[in-house]
UniProtKB/Swiss-Prot annotation:
Pathway(s) of this molecule: Carbohydrate acid metabolism; tartrate degradation; 2-hydroxy-3-oxosuccinate from L-tartrate: step 1/1; Carbohydrate acid metabolism; tartrate degradation; 2-hydroxy-3-oxosuccinate from meso-tartrate: step 1/1; Carbohydrate acid metabolism; tartrate degradation; D-glycerate from L-tartrate: step 1/1
Signal peptide location: none
EC identifiers of the protein: 1.1.1.93, 4.1.1.73, 1.1.1.83
PANTHER family in alphabetical order: D-MALATE DEHYDROGENASE [DECARBOXYLATING] (PTHR43275:SF1)
Protein known as: Probable tartrate dehydrogenase/decarboxylase TtuC'
Organism: Agrobacterium vitis (Rhizobium vitis)
Gene Ontology CC: one annotated term: cytoplasm
Length: 358
């Protein structure tokens, strides 16, 4: 029996709702497979923890997480806590502290979901966005001076290192090489940002020589939004900076139907630390407690987690079950359905129990 230790951090808003659904589906997979076991420990960190203790997680939070095989994360952010506190107090310290430098965000149109793009079928939008997750625009460097005065100044410094850019570029090329189309698009803004972004372009060209079977091109980030919208079929694997990929992946989720179906994995490819898996969507306080949060993104990111742990059959079984449920029209309101979170979760669990695909 293969056993894994998972740290669950539901955190804020709909996070507890979708993580509970995700754990229910993982339990169904355990029962269906019969050859692996997941042991989960839940941590109450997040905005409510901050209101009680003045911090989003305890000082020894990373030490507590080190012993786990993976981290299953919900969502962070609350209306009554500044966003920079919630982000820099919980999610980013985990990503950066565990050197989860590869943020991997697959996007495709699931069966039964109608995308907003006219004449865009399931095969026309099937991407993976690779986001540099350790430096760049989210390095945390900068400051404020002369606060409250007319001369007040704020600086936000983006830091790009040769080591950081090279390793994410190599990761993206390897991923593109493993996909059927062997196609990679490198996104920058090197016409206007003439230092770090030009270095990105140069390093991309250097790394490309290691992967002669991968066809690659480069795009400016503003032009990329147009290409994603008008010519989605021309794209496959995409790599971009921390900020650019953050924005583009939200657009990708919307183009596929909803952020409610968009997953992400924060990966330490060297496996020195646990990697973290989370849905892209935010805490969504406007629907918190209504029972209508879309759990599909959480199920998909659970599949990413299983694949990372080496449970590829279980990951495939989960995604097969998800696609059968969406194709049957059992959908939450954000993708045009009438089902609630529990109904979608139950349907996926039933599909797993009856699955004979593997």
């Amino acid at each position: 029996m293969r056993e894994y230790k998972i740290a669950a951090i539901p955190a804020d808003g709909i996070g507890p709702e979708v993580i509970a659904a995700g754990l229910q589906v993982l339990e169904a997979l355990e029962q269906r497979s019969g050859d692996f076991k997941i042991h989960t420990e839940t941590f109450d960190w997040g905005s409510d923890y901050y209101k009680k203790h003045g911090v989003m997680m305890p000082a020894d939070g990373l030490d507590k997480l080190k012993k786990f095989d993976a981290i299953f994360f919900g969502a962070v952010g609350a209306p009554d806590v500044p966003d920079h506190i919630t982000l820099w107090g919980l999610r980013l310290p985990i990503c950066q502290g565990f050197d989860q430098y590869a943020n991997v965000r697959p996007t495709k149109i699931l069966p039964g979901i109608t995308p907003p793009l006219r004449n865009c079928g399931p095969g026309d939008l099937d991407w993976v966005i690779v986001r540099e997750n350790s430096e760049g625009e989210y390095s945390g460097h900068g400051g404020r001076a002369h606060r409250g005065l007319p001369e007040e100044v704020g600086t936000e410094v983006a830091i790009f290192t040769r080591v950081g850019v090279t390793r994410i570029m190599r990761y993206a090329f390897k991923l593109a090489q493993a996909r059927p189309r062997k196609l990679l698009t490198v996104v920058t803004k090197s016409n206007a940002q003439r230092h770090g972004m030009v270095m990105w372009d140069e390093i991309a060209a250097e790394v490309a020589t290691e992967f002669p079977d991968v066809t690659w091109d480069k795009m400016l980030v503003d032009a990329m939004t147009v290409r994603m919208t008008l010519k989605p079929e021309t794209l496959d694997t995409i790599v971009a900076t921390n900020l650019h990929a953050d924005i583009l992946s939200d657009l990708a989720g919307a183009l596929a139907g909803s952020l409610g179906v968009a997953p992400t994995a924060n990966i330490d490819p060297e496996r020195r630390f646990p990697s973290m898996f989370e849905p892209i969507h935010g805490s969504a306080f406007d629907i918190t407690g209504k029972g209508i949060a879309n759990p599909i993104a959480t199920f998909w990111t659970a599949a990413q987690m299983l694949e990372h742990l080496g449970e590829r059959d279980a990951a495939a079984r989960l995604m097969g079950a998800v696609e059968r449920v969406t194709e049957a029209g059992i959908l939450t309101p954000d993708v045009g359905g009438t089902a609630n979170t529990s109904q979608v979760t139950e349907a996926v669990c039933n599909a797993i129990a009856g699955s004979n695909i593997i």
